[in-house]
UniProtKB/Swiss-Prot annotation:
SUPFAM superfamilies: Aspartate carbamoyltransferase, Regulatory-chain, C-terminal domain (SSF57825), Aspartate carbamoyltransferase, Regulatory-chain, N-terminal domain (SSF54893). This is Aspartate carbamoyltransferase regulatory chain. It comes from Methanoregula boonei (strain DSM 21154 / JCM 14090 / 6A8). GO terms for cellular component: aspartate carbamoyltransferase complex. The keyword Zinc applies. The keyword Repressor does not apply. InterPro entries: Asp_carbamoyltransf_reg_N (IPR020545), Asp_carbamoylTrfase_reg (IPR002801), Asp_carbamoyltrfase_reg_C (IPR020542), Asp_carbatrfase_reg_C_sf (IPR036792), Asp_carbatrfase_reg_N_sf (IPR036793). Keywords: Metal-binding, Pyrimidine biosynthesis, Zinc. Belongs to the PyrI family. One of its GO terms (molecular function) is metal ion binding. Its cofactor is Zn(2+). Disulfide bonds: none annotated. Contains catalytic and regulatory chains. Involved in allosteric regulation of aspartate carbamoyltransferase.
Amino acid sequence: MRHIAAADTGDDEGEGLLVRRIKNGTVIDHIDGGEALNVIRILGISGTTNEALSIATNVPSKHMGSTKDIVKISNRELSKEEVDRIALISPNATINIIRHFKVCEKQGVEIPTVIEGSVRCPNPGCITRTNEPIRTRFAVLPDGKGLRCLYCDSVITKDLTSYII
């Protein structure tokens, strides 16, 4: 088992949070501190799923220079669309695919230039908000800190997680 240090618990003994290894599944590491619950939400994971889930929040990280969150999901590998959604809210995240207790794939997320079907347009008059069978399409702004609807040009720069489907 590997120990993952918890955020300062006031424990001078140096004991941290013990998170069990997973046999198969995905570990999402280097999530921006405080974003783990948003990651869980955008992946559609709720208390009614059968996936074993471990969450560590505000873990000190030398790599990130502050704190990070970690999410472990047993028996599930993420789709490219799910990884793209994570990149929108935590561009430093790392995705580790675990098989038989070993990391067999490790990749950093990349913010896509265009994202389809994963974000709801804030404009109630946008064609994607009608009953037309049209998937949303957003261009990621050059600074990576917002999205522009490719149908109506509405821009989202604040509270992006509330628009992720």
